[in-house]
Every structure is written in C-alpha cells, then in structure tokens.
Amino acid sequence: MVCNSQPVRMDDQPIAALILAAGFSSRMKMVKPLLPMEGQTVIELVIGLFQMIGIADTLVVLGYAADQLIPVLNKQGVSYVINEDYRRGMFSSVCKGVEHLKEGCGAFFVLPADMPFVRAETLQKLVCAFRETGKAVYRPHYQGRLGHPPLISATLIPAILAFKGPGGLRALLAAYEERCVDVACDDPGILIDLDTPEDYQKYRFPYKPSRY
C-alpha cells in the first residue's frame, strides 16, 4: 500500500470529519477546546488538521460551553451541531454527529477535540487504506496501541444509530472486528489527549509533532 503526502482526493465517496467537543472538561477545569496552543486554540488545531488533507466536510459536535465555542467555529467557517444530551456521554455526540452527516458521505473520521497532535500523514494512511480495501473500520495504531481517530465507513451508520448497549463506539466497533483494518502509524499523537492540567503543561511546549 503506497500513500503520498498530497491532499487526499474527496471526489469519490467523500470523507467527512466529526470533531467531538461537547464534554464537560471536568478534570481540566477549563474548556479544553479553547486552550491556547501554538498561537491558536486546540479546536482550531484539530480543525486545521482535517483541512490540511483536503477534507471540506467537517462537523463539530457541541454541548457544554457551546456558546463559547460557536464564535470560534463561525470564524473558521466550520459547521456545528449542538448535542443537548451531551451529559449522556461521548457516544451521544457521535450519534448526533452521524445524524447530520451530508448525504453521500463514504466514510468519516471521529476525533475528540482534545487530541490536537495527530499527524496529517496518519489521516492520509487511513484514507488510503479505505480506498484500497473497502472494509468498514480503519484504526490507527502506534507501537501496538490503538488510537484516534478511527475512519468509519458510512455503511455502519445504521448500526451506530441503533446501538443501545454499553461501551459506546468502542464496543460497537469491536462487534465488527472482522471488518476492521489496523493501520500502523509512526504517530504518538494518536494516543495523546489533553485530559488534565498536567497533560496540558506537559505537551503545550515540549511536544512539537510534525503535522505532516
């Protein structure tokens, strides 16, 4: 499988991105998507990651502190939807986002808004695998550990919306293990989220990932 560093083609089976930004940020004590980083906010870095590879259909799912995030998204020209049930957890935001994907979407990424260190090259590898193999789920892994974002075929949308069991998206995708492809990536950023003030201080300055 060969992938290059050029922007991925989106003309056949368009690919979308869901950014999950509805959570409480309870351990951070601040609104995580609005934390300053690299001269921007964290949410702007995450949005820019998808723009970098040519994904035009990016949808941000909001909930807690939506009023603070909306001006940033409007400035970026990015679409958003508000999950009124965000207190029910991240999977409720996944479902809200999936409900609002544009018709004709071939596959979609799901990335929490507190993970700004994923590399564009990783996304390109996942898209390349999707184009070449036609499976249902593509999961990046680094040194044997699965990370974010998965790339999920739109064929699983009905199953996602119908799922009522425990464990959320991870449990649902595990039920389709035989249709999953794990893609090796030289990218520790797929494992790094900004969950606590200590995480933010640790990665704010010393961690300088290649975005490509």
Report each predicted region and the residues it spans.
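N-terminal glycine-rich phosphate-binding loop and ensuing alpha1 helix
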Residues: 11-63, 67
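Conserved donor nucleotide-binding strand/loop of the catalytic core
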Residues: 77-88
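Acidic helix N-cap motif at the loop->helix transition within catalytic regions
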Residues: 67-73
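Conserved alpha/beta core of the MobA/IspD/sugar-nucleotide pyrophosphorylase nucleotidyltransferase superfamily
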Residues: 2-13, 158, 162-212
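Short, structured coil segments at secondary-structure junctions
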Residues: 54, 74-77, 152, 156, ...
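Short aromatic/basic micro-patch
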Residues: 36, 117, 150-151, 182, ...
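Conserved beta-loop-beta/alpha segment of the NTase-like Rossmann-fold superfamily
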Residues: 87-159
